[in-house]
């Protein structure tokens, strides 16, 4: 029997639903108790007929109150055990009723933790989740948009029409809806209607996959289904102090390391052909490599070079190639430019199999204004500050996260944990930390607001960074958290319980600037700038420093490393070799940008390949061989890394010979351990009898020489090493008389006697 129950309010409800203004569809749709029976109401825009089908009966539903609200009466609550047969435009289909699945997805504890900013795994609730409810497969959508008037799921399932699938608003500004029948790979967005009536289409902030640019939709994607094989790697990583290990990082941008021809087959991990992703309009005829192809090419290359880690410039989804990945719109998704999330997982897994760690650039300092992203998300400044003096980087054209809002901090902190949990990464480098710490960063007077103490420190950002690092090391004690922080802010690498920011490494920007300034000087004038090459040791042990020659130093007219060097080609190569060797022997972990390892000549261009053809020339092969051997020497000699952050690990022999631009020092492992002697000559002048003091007599084997012929040098040296003489110099009774080749660095190792 069909009974129509006329409620005056239903006309208004139907009108609000049809205009996407209803925040509580569960209050009228689905099974509703009425006296001793149950009314089933179905919202079905543009349907001409709807039938309710159960195991026992089939009922033709009526629409007496609104043309798109169909209803009928059952004796008992059917729960979710019914289907609806819909006729729309003469086409019939059968589906389950989304509004029959009424149980809350986000429980009270989840909401509480999220509201206080402490739900470290919030991505397991937010976003689009393939799941099963009452044995019915589908997708649960969950979104935080507290100021929205209504939210709908739109996609191919409803022809991108927001009237079809309005979501239910829960406590805490959470919106939920389970849609049966959706599957992996389906596209979706959220249509958000604001209190002012404006309508925005937004990608899912917690989406696990997004379309390839320039498309902007989110993609339903599985998590937790990948079969990892790196359990031993993860266990070893989390049970040792990463700072007590050699760390040599190859920074790279996946989209410009190498391209393939558009004509080359483009095959996914299942062996299926698919459409190639063009590199860019600026590189016609080329396509991006896939994660699988990159694994096959990058991993053997990096392993042969001897690097311990790969640092990937941001791979979180981003719409504009020219941002290099630093303007993120898809925080919980690796970019689809190179393949699927599981294909990126396979890339990381393959790296771990070969003993290579993965560090990701993470950008919690700002986000772009793209309409489908976080900006003005629910009609309010939800993720950003409303005042541009606090909430906008005008020079970058980006917005700044409101770190004072618990849910925003939660979004970011959980995102950090997400990458370690879901993709097994080993570390992060946080970009542009100084822009977060200072309220007046890149701002003229009058365009920033002082803190409550009248200063320029951003206390909210400080607390966020402390929370992020504290939570990270709680969950992943062997992780790396690296700060790109360009100022003298104190305590960047101090633990949070000592009021530090909690990072365990900081890029040494001062060292980088001093080194490049020094090496760009004509060698004959370096004698007047000796402080540049020695000053870093004065503050080296105030933080845990990483020495970095990054992508930022080879763009925007700065030229690549080789071309920064003065002199003719021979001197350019020799200077490059000397700088790299000094970097590898100086205290601190190491990072260089792709191309530096073989002497790239052109500036880095995000749309182009590296100049691989240069490896057809001996000087470039020599630089590559030098980097290989530096990495192997570095890993083989604990004196070069074990005491990077302990003053005992470094001691000058002589840093005052500015006339000859020569420095000498020792790297020491431990009190009774081995040490190395390093001597650097930063002029083209050969010194055939250069004496330095050494602490112990014996034989000093020359174990590395940047002037070796295999590196492209002149092959001057010390015939394998030198024995000490009883000659007092530099405060030592014993000394060795060395041949210092031009523009060279020597590494010598003490032995009790010559073999």
UniProtKB/Swiss-Prot annotation:
Keywords: Carbohydrate metabolism, Glycogen biosynthesis, Glycogen metabolism, Glycosyltransferase, Transferase. The keyword Transferase applies. GO terms for cellular component: cytosol. InterPro entries: A-amylase/branching_C, Branching_enzy, GlgB, GlgB_N, GlgB_N_E_set_prok, Glyco_hydro_13_cat_dom, Glyco_hydro_13_N, Glyco_hydro_b. It catalyses: Transfers a segment of a (1->4)-alpha-D-glucan chain to a primary hydroxy group in a similar glucan chain. Monomer. Belongs to the glycosyl hydrolase 13 family. GlgB subfamily. This is 1,4-alpha-glucan branching enzyme GlgB. It comes from Prochlorococcus marinus (strain NATL2A).
């Amino acid at each position: 029997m069909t009974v129509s129950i006329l409620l005056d309010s239903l006309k208004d409800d139907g009108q609000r639903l049809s205009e996407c203004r209803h925040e509580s569809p569960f209050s009228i749709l689905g099974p509703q108790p009425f006296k001793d029976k149950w009314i089933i109401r179905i919202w079905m825009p543009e349907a001409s007929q709807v039938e309710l089908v159960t195991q026992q009966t089939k009922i033709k539903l009526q629409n007496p109150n609104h043309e798109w609200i169909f209803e009928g009466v059952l004796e008992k609550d059917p729960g979710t055990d019914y289907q609806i047969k819909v006729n729309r435009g003469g086409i019939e289909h059968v589906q389950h009723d989304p509004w029959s699945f009424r149980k809350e997805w986000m429980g009270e504890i989840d909401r509480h933790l999220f509201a206080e900013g402490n739900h470290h795994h919030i991505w397991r609730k937010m976003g689009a989740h393939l799941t099963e409810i009452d044995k019915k497969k589908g997708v649960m959508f969950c979104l935080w948009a507290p100021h929205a008037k209504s939210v709908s799921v739109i996609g191919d399932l409803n022809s991108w029409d927001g009237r079809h699938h309005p979501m239910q608003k829960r406590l805490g500004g959470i919106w939920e809806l389970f849609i049966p029948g959706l599957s992996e790979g389906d596209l979706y967005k959220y249509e958000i209607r604001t209190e002012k009536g404006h309508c925005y289409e937004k990608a899912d902030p917690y989406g696990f996959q997004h379309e390839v640019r320039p498309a902007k939709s989110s993609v339903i994607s599985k998590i937790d289904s990948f079969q990892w094989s790196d359990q031993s790697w993860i266990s070893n990583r989390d049970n040792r102090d990463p700072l007590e290990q050699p760390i040599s990082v190859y920074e790279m941008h996946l989209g410009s390391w190498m391209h393939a021809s558009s004509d080359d087959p483009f095959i996914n991990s299942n062996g299926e052909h698919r459409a190639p992703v063009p590199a860019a309009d600026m590189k016609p005829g080329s396509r991006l490599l896939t994660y699988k192809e990159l694994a096959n090419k990058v991993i053997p290359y990096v392993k042969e070079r001897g690097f311990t880690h790969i640092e990937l410039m941001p791979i979180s989804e981003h719409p504009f190639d020219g941002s290099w990945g630093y303007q993120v719109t898809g925080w919980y998704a690796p970019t689809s430019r190179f393949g699927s999330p599981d294909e990126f997982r396979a890339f990381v897994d393959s790296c771990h199999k070969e003993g290579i760690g993965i560090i990701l650039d993470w950008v919690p300092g700002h986000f772009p204004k793209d309409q489908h992203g976080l900006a003005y998300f629910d009609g309010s400044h939800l993720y950003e500050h409303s005042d541009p003096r606090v909430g906008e980087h005008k020079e970058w054209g980006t917005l700044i996260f409101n770190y004072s809002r618990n849910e925003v901090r939660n979004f970011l902190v959980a995102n950090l944990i997400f990458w370690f949990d879901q993709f097994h990464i080993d570390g992060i480098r946080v970009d542009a930390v100084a822009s977060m710490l200072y309220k007046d960063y890149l701002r003229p007077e009058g365009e920033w607001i002082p803190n409550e103490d009248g200063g320029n420190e951003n206390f909210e950002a400080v607390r966020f960074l402390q929370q992020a690092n504290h939570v990270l090391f709680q969950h992943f004690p062997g992780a790396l958290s690296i700060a790109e922080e360009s100022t003298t802010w104190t305590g960047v690498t101090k633990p949070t319980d000592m009021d530090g920011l909690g990072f365990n490494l900081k890029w040494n920007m001062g060292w980088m600037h001093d080194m490049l300034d020094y090496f760009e000087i004509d060698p004959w004038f370096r004698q007047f700038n000796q402080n540049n090459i020695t000053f870093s040791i004065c503050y080296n042990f105030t933080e845990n420093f990483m020495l970095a020659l990054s992508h930022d130093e080879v763009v925007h007219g700065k030229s690549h490393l080789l071309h920064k060097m003065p002199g003719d080609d021979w001197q350019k190569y020799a200077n490059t070799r000397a700088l790299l060797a000094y970097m590898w022997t100086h205290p601190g972990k190491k990072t260089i940008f792709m191309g530096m390892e073989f002497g790239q000549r052109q500036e880095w261009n995000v749309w182009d390949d590296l100049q691989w053809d240069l490896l057809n020339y001996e000087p470039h092969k020599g630089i590559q061989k030098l980097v290989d051997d530096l990495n192997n020497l570095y890993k083989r000699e604990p004196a070069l890394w074990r005491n990077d952050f302990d003053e005992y690990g470094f001691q000058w022999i002589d840093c005052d010979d500015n006339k000859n631009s020569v420095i000498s020092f020792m790297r020491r492992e431990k009190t009774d351990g081995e040490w190395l002697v390093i001597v650097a000559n930063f002029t083209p002048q050969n010194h055939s009898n250069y004496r330095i003091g050494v602490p112990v007599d014996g034989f000093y084997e020359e174990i590395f020489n940047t002037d070796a012929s295999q590196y492209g040098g002149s092959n001057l040296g010390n015939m394998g090493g030198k024995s000490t003489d009883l000659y007092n110099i530099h405060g030592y009774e014993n000394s060795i008389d060395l041949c210092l080749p031009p523009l060279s660095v020597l590494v010598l190792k003490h032995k009790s006697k010559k073999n």
